[in-house]
Amino acid sequence: MNPAAFLISLPIRFYRLVISPMIASNCRYTPTCSSYAMEALRKHGAIKGTWLAARRVSRCHPWGGSGIDNVPD
């Protein structure tokens, strides 16, 4: 993971360690949105990874889809 992607991943890591354990799992997709975001940052870097993660989170709502949604290659 490049330095920019690492910096962007810090809030996601904070969410996963501190906030996520306090709330029920609400993600409609597999893998979870935070796992998807981390994988997208690792695979695609800061710019495209952030774009993919933002698109995914925007789809994760009660009227959105559900199921398996892996990070594209």
Swiss-Prot record:
The keyword Cell inner membrane applies. Its main location: membrane. Coiled coil: none annotated. Keywords: Cell inner membrane, Cell membrane, Membrane. It is found in: Cell inner membrane. InterPro entries: Membr_insert_effic_factor_YidD. It is a peripheral membrane protein. GO terms for cellular component: plasma membrane. It comes from the Bacteria. Could be involved in insertion of integral membrane proteins into the membrane. Belongs to the UPF0161 family. This is Putative membrane protein insertion efficiency factor. It comes from Jannaschia sp. (strain CCS1).
